[in-house]
Amino acid sequence: SGQNTTNLLTVSFRSDATQGALADLLMRHQLVIVDGPSALRLYRLEVSKDQDPVAVALALRRETGLIESVEVSR
C-alpha cells in the first residue's frame, strides 16, 4: 500500500457539551474518537479518508456551542 497519512484532529469540547450533542456532531462530520480525553480534556479524532481534515477543522470551529479548539494533527 502507498503512503499512509493519518487524518487526525486534536479537539477540545466545551465542558457543558452533552454526550448526545457530541455523538451527533461526530456522526455529522464522520469522525471517530481514537484517543482521549487527555488530562487537558483533548481528544484525537480521525477524519474519514474521503474528507479533507482542514475543511473538517474549519467546519468544527463554527460549532462554537460544542467545540473549544480544533487543531489538525500531522
Feature map (PLM): residue ranges:
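Juxtamembrane extracytoplasmic segments of single-/few-pass membrane proteins
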Residues: 1-42
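Helix N-cap motif at beta-to-alpha junctions
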Residues: 15-18, 48-54
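Short amphipathic alpha-helices in soluble, non-transmembrane regions
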Residues: 22-29, 53-65
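Conserved short beta-strand edge segments in small beta-sheet-based binding/regulatory domains
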Residues: 34-37, 64-74
